[in-house]
């Protein structure tokens, strides 16, 4: 989920 954190950092990566 590390990649999701980078890609979703601008959207909902705040929770991850």
UniProtKB/Swiss-Prot annotation:
<dbReference type="GO" id="GO:0008691">
    <property type="term" value="F:3-hydroxybutyryl-CoA dehydrogenase activity"/>
</dbReference>
<keyword id="KW-0276">Fatty acid metabolism</keyword>
<keyword id="KW-0443">Lipid metabolism</keyword>
<dbReference type="GO" id="GO:0019605">
    <property type="term" value="P:butyrate metabolic process"/>
</dbReference>
<comment type="similarity">
    <text>Belongs to the 3-hydroxyacyl-CoA dehydrogenase family.</text>
</comment>
<comment type="pathway">
    <text>Lipid metabolism; butanoate metabolism.</text>
</comment>
<keyword id="KW-0521">NADP</keyword>
<protein>
    <recommendedName>
        <fullName>3-hydroxybutyryl-CoA dehydrogenase</fullName>
        <ecNumber>1.1.1.157</ecNumber>
    </recommendedName>
</protein>
<keyword id="KW-0560">Oxidoreductase</keyword>
